């Protein structure tokens, strides 16, 4: 399998100067003409796709304002679509918006809504549906996507199939924002999401949160040529990596996500199984501390923890080398604005001890972890614990239940294990994670200088200056934030050799969580 090696910003389709000067519209052909899967033969209809996935819980909902992990993303894209889709290389391409353009300055955007598309109920898609769906994440809402739309000043209906979005400050990345998985398009006025009424390929047949979800293909031809080939899809929640792998080996499922790096080389020897590896596009694995709470208020405590973790040993022993060193922020090496000059904190027990002494504490620091957070979280924490001993510091690794981890531990525990998924732009990486007051700012990091840099970088036309701004953002997080991001993993999926469409992607695993829509059986 060819590794995914490059991506543009992760890859705005247009030159930023041309786009902000007034981009020409993007057409339908860009969306579907060059899918790598097409090279594997003509798509065939039929069959039941069985998925075994990690990344969900019993508290999962069909409400797009609640999505936070892989399984909700995957099932939402069975039923609904977004305005914009991200292709395998990381480019923004048309989905329900057939084209878009911006006026000079990128503060006014016009999106042309595709005609002839209907929801499951038979209602025709129109501008009112799009405006309502975007507004679900604006104003009084707990949606994690609220921060992404903070600069949206007004959304205006220009015609039944055209809207204008006016921003308070220019943002050339707006199409990428509208590809965010929270931004699915629902009928105007929808308040009950338990019975999905979408423009997607499938309808809901069965739903047991935390157990499984079953979807059936809609009758007739799907509006995307070559897609929606399976008769039905069964997605099972399988949180244990060993159980997922065994389910694939014994033909109980057709594809799995988040393959354990420790077993992938052995699994690849199975002639009935193929591996999909998206190098550097996987999760950002970290331990995060709330820096408005003691003892993590102390910058020296955080520097002690950052110098006191042996990242290379974790990557070697937990990820079997299928990862790169993390820089204590979420921007990865595939991103155009990744600061290649930045050096990772070396494992230096003496320097860690110096900072702990300066802070007046060497622990114990309680770190809450669970395999429910991610496979390898516990082993990573134990290695962290051992590496800190050489700095004369104590780490108390507290193992907690995986059930409800994201509701009960994340954003609440002072120090815990977390992972962050990939995002197609630097702005999306930084805005949701580190800007003051954001719902998912899981370190409570707050720095006005950083916040201003993020805003200013969105509209900066000079690429060299923009690079400098993002480099400074990374430097600040590297030195100040409460994130100890020790590894950026490769996205590792595995599936049956008869399955087509399980390809590397620049953003998420399982072909951007669209395998149900994109795949077929040979």
Residue ranges with predicted function:
Residues 14, 26-27, 69, 208-212, ...:
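Detector for C-terminal structural segments
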Residues 220-266, 385-386, 394:
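Ligand-site clamp/hinge motif
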Residues 1-14, 25-30:
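N-terminal secretory signal peptides
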Residues 87-91, 178-228, 232-234, 240-242, ...:
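Gly/Pro-rich hinge or "lid" segments in bacterial periplasmic/extracellular proteins
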Residues 52-104, 135, 197-199:
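N-terminal lobe/hinge region of extracytoplasmic solute-binding protein
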Residues 98-143, 158, 164, 247, ...:
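Aromatic- and charge-enriched surface segment that lines or borders ligand/interaction sites
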Residues 50, 126-133, 160-166, 200-201, ...:
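Alpha-helical secondary-structure segments
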Residues 112, 146-188, 206-208:
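Surface-exposed binding/hinge segments that line
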């Amino acid at each position: 399998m060819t590794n995914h090696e490059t991506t543009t910003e992760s890859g705005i389709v247009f030159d930023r100067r041309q786009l902000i000067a007034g981009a020409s519209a993007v057409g339908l052909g860009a969306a579907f003409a060059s899918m790598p899967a097409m090279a594997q033969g003509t798509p065939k209809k039929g069959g039941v796709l069985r998925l075994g996935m990690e990344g969900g819980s019993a508290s999962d909902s069909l409400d797009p304002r609640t999505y936070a992990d892989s399984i909700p993303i995957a099932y939402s894209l069975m039923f609904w679509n977004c305005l914009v889709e991200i292709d395998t290389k990381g480019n923004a391409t048309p989905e329900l918006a057939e084209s878009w353009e911006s006026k000079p300055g990128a503060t006014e955007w016009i999106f042309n809504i595709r005609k002839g598309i209907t929801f499951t109920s038979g209602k025709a898609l129109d501008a009112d549906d799009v405006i309502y769906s975007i507004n679900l994440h604006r104003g009084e809402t707990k949606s994690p996507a609220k921060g992404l739309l903070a600069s949206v000043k007004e959304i205006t209906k220009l015609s039944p199939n055209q809207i204008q979005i006016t921003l308070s400050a220019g943002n050339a990345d707006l199409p990428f924002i509208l590809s965010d998985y929270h931004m699915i398009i629902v009928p105007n006025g929808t308040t009950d999401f338990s019975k999905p009424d979408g423009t997607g390929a499938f309808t809901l047949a069965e739903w047991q949160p935390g157990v499984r979800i079953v979807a059936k293909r809609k009758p007739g031809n799907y509006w995307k040529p070559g897609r929606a080939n399976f008769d039905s899809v069964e997605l099972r929640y399988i949180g244990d990596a060993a159980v997922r792998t065994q389910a694939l080996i014994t033909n109980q499922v057709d594809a799995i996500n988040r393959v354990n790096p420790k077993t992938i080389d052995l699994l690849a020897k199975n002639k009935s199984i193929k591996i999909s590896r998206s190098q550097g596009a996987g999760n950002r694995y970290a331990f995060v501390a709330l820096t408005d709470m003691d003892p993590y208020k102390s910058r020296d405590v955080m520097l002690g923890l950052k110098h006191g973790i042996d990242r290379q040993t974790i990557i070697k022993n937990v990820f079997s080398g299928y990862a790169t060193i993390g820089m204590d922020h979420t921007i990865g090496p595939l991103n155009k604005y990744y600061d290649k000059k930045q050096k990772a904190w070396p494992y230096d027990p003496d320097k860690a001890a110096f900072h702990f002494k300066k802070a007046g504490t060497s622990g114990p620091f309680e770190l809450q972890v669970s395999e429910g957070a991610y496979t390898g979280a516990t082993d990573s924490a134990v290695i962290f614990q051992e590496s800190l001993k050489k700095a004369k510091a104590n780490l108390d690794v507290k193992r907690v239940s995986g059930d409800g981890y994201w509701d009960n531990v994340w954003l609440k525990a002072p120090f815990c294990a977390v992972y962050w998924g990939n995002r197609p732009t630097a702005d999306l990486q930084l805005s949701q994670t580190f800007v003051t007051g954001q719902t998912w700012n899981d370190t409570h990091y707050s720095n006005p200088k950083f916040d201003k840099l993020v805003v200013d970088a969105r509209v900066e036309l000079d690429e060299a200056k923009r690079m400098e701004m993002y480099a400074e953002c990374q430097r600040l997080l590297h030195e100040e934030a409460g994130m100890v991001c020790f590894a950026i993993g490769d996205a590792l999926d595995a599936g049956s050799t008869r399955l087509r469409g399980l390809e590397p992607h620049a953003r998420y695993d399982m072909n951007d969580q669209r395998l149900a829509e994109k795949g077929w059986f040979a």
